[in-house]
Amino acid sequence: MKENFIIKPDGSKHVITPKNGKKFELEELQEIVGGYIEVIRLNNKHNQCMIVNEMGKLYNLEHNAEASVIAHSEKAIFDSDFIVGNAVIINSEQLD
C-alpha cells in the first residue's frame, strides 16, 4: 500500500495517517480540505483516490499545480480542469 499524503497548493507534501489508525473519517477529511469533500478516483494500480474540496473553485481556493498534474496524468479529470486547495491522496479502501 502506498503512503497517504496531503498535497498543499504550495507544492509541499505531508504524509498522513487516519486518526483511528485504519480508515479516514468523513469529518477528518473535511477538516483537511476545508469543506465538503469530492472524491476523484485515480486510475492507478494502487487503488488510490484524491480528496478535494467540492466547492473549492467557488471559494477561489489557490490552484494546486502538483495535484492537478497527478490528476491529469491519471486521466482522472478533463484536460481543461484543475485542482484547487489541499488535495489528499489515500488508498480507496481507507475511505470510511
Would you name each region that the model predicts?
Residues 1-32, 36-96:
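Detector for the mature cores of small, proteolytically processed
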